[in-house]
């Protein structure tokens, strides 16, 4: 990433842009509100502004850093499909720091992860709770990791209903179906039995990184990045 001074020098000397205009642009690009969203990338000139998450996509990295809803799920599914079309043999990495969210939206991400050809590695960078924990353990076996102070939490699906008694019964049956699906998924990827997952998930079941490894939610705890 280039510095503000280097960018200004290039714009004025090489592109003939006046200093006033450059200063206005630079104040926008390097302002506090932009620091976490964009980077300035140099690739054989000219410089270009790139959304930081788009830049990570170029390295086949997807970031799930918010609650899971339909909007986020659609984006992640589209990113997975796009990266598969770009290279069906190269791994994809999903970094997860999420409290969970919609089970239906999360299952869409899960099914896409299992459907595409590239191996999907999952890395927890802070918290993977509820539906996010399901996605974490659903990564390629041997490629599921978490940082040292990662927290992983599993529990039974949450839901509610109102209206006529028959409608409430229908909703309750659907929640029970989702519960079984989620427990089957966790059991399949963690190596635990369905009964163990059912018992542990009756209430919020929190695990630190090493406990998540012992449980089978991840394969390795990352403490120091290995030099390239």
What are these regions (language model features)?
Residues 1-228:
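Terminal-region recognition feature
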């Amino acid at each position: 990433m280039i510095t503000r001074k280097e960018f200004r020098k290039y714009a004025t000397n090489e592109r003939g842009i006046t200093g006033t205009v450059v200063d206005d642009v630079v104040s926008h690009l390097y302002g506090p509100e932009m620091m976490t969203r964009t980077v300035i990338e140099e690739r054989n000139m000219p410089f270009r502004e790139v959304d930081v998450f788009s830049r990570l996509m170029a390295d086949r990295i997807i970031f799930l850093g918010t609650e899971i809803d339909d909007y986020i799920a659609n984006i992640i599914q589209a990113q997975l499909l796009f990266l598969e079309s770009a290279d069906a043999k190269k791994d994809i990495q999903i970094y997860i720091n999420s409290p969970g969210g919609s089970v239906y939206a999360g299952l869409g991400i899960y099914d896409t992860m299992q459907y595409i050809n590239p191996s999907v590695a999952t890395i927890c960078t802070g918290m993977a709770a509820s539906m996010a924990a399901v996605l974490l353990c659903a990564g390629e076996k041997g490629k599921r990791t978490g940082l040292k102070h990662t927290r992983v939490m599993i529990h039974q699906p949450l839901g509610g209903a109102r209206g006529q008694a028959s409608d409430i019964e229908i909703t309750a049956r659907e929640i029970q179906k989702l519960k079984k699906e989620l427990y089957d998924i966790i059991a399949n990827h963690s190596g635990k039995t369905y009964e163990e997952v059912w018992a542990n998930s009756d209430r919020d079941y929190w695990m630190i990184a090493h406990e998540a490894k012992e449980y089978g939610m991840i394969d390795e705890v990352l403490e120091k990045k290995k030099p390239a």
